[in-house]
Amino acid sequence: MRVLGRMAALVGAAAMLVAIPGNARAASPKFSETTTIGTHNAYEKGKYTYWAQALDSGASLLELDVYADSVSRRWRVSHDKPLANDNNCEYADEPSELYSKDRNQDLGSCLDNMAAWNQLHPDHAPIVVKVEMKAGFNNDAGLGPDEFDTLVSKKLGSSVYKPSDLLGGSYSSLDAAAKANAWPTRDALKGKFVFELIPGTVEESNPLDSYWTDEEYGDHLRDLYAAGRIGEAQAFPAVLGAANGDPRTSRYDASIRPWFVFFDGDAATYVNSGYDTSFYSTNHYILIMTDAYGVSPAISSTNPTDAEVAARLALLAKDHASIITSDWSAKSASVLGSVATRG
């Protein structure tokens, strides 16, 4: 281990771990009880040559930008090309094909890569796949929540941790399940992907679009549950944007508020503004803090030292984050795979 890596490990251990005597083994913490690190826009070729390398990175969250292309009726993966693919996902659906095939593929191929990689790493730590629907769903073109669920289910099957898994047959809403801390342990989530959905920047700036991804998928979850089909849903919609208090109250109809247990917003806004983020950990909600580098004192957004990453993780764990994200793709798997105790 390099000196800085050792320092980071020691800092993290001292700040966040409790010593276990003798040969006793600590029980695996629940998914809601830890703080981990994710990579913003991990599909970009400048960060990882191949999507499989992003999966190898140790990061606990990887982000995809997706466009619903009404012309081709395909899910495009790109930052700013709604009718084309520009990404590190390969045309590969077998483990032996990874790290070698043509890139710039659609969402289906990104999921194929994940399925193939999963065969090589069946006990990997849980990975949140954050999907930004850049311009929203397009239900009229056959690219709505139902079709998204169908694609994810077809490609990844039982390797997805779904809303119905959190409900477990015991709770009538995701909110009730989260408040009961019904989340599984991290060990129980080995080999699993968890999908988070957020509205996209194009959608948010479109004056003709007032039905954003979060609300549309929230309606979708409510309706599936009412129809006895909640098992079909593959993703958790997130409330986007840092706010004080419970942002669901002012944003959504009361009928869908209980279907939001993921929250996603700028770390500096949460922390530097003094928002009471204990609300999220008290209720066992999943809180993703983005642009973690920007919290005072700011550190590099791309390549901070290992010790700086460890300190930032410890700081934001105390501020009740579940996952902190930045563009730290240059960091090693031992750094990006760090797990801290939340709260």
PLM features: residue spans?
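Secretory targeting and sorting signals
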Residues: M1-A26
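Catalytic cores of phosphodiester-bond hydrolases, prominently lipid phosphodiesterases
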Residues: A27-G343
